[in-house]
């Protein structure tokens, strides 16, 4: 029986690539929206997905004009589920907005807008699987054990980024060109890994990105917990 993964989302169309990536590694996605008000009872891991900007009030700031309208119910749900997952030592994979929420949950702050949008593709129509820039993975991190350290090409579509780092977490990757944080993790947890790019869009074209989901599946199946 495949292990179940709670997948947070608000747009059924956008959640499908995450679900597909999980199925590729033998996991069963259980999509959850804010209005579902569920706990993690009966699931074996948590996937925090992309979406709108985290409410700046959660890190003590007023929104800038470029900041998207917040979705407080989703912020509250994901804070609650992340807290529950960390407390129970369930594997957590956080992607894009998920990484930003992971940092804010731990007391960190965000850069509300990267001027000039250096981390968003200018292509129209954009191909989400196309790499946009290089990251450098920090040696001796969980991410390095999964992807190997050194440089990797990743896709990118975010206009916010980690500013002040939260507590109990470490940086596992940075953008080569401008030093923007691209990976975070909790070293004291069996698997609590966050990435700023969208590996779910690259799993069919880049074996390296599939490794991230394979490692998540291994942790969920008891391999590194």
Predicted regions and their residues:
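Generic enzyme active-site microenvironment
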Residues: 196
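Conserved G/P- and acidic residue-centered "switch" motifs that form tight phosphate/ATP-binding loops
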Residues: 96
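The feature captures the ABC ATPase H-loop/switch
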Residues: 99
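Catalytic histidine neighborhood in serine/cysteine hydrolases
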Residues: 189-193
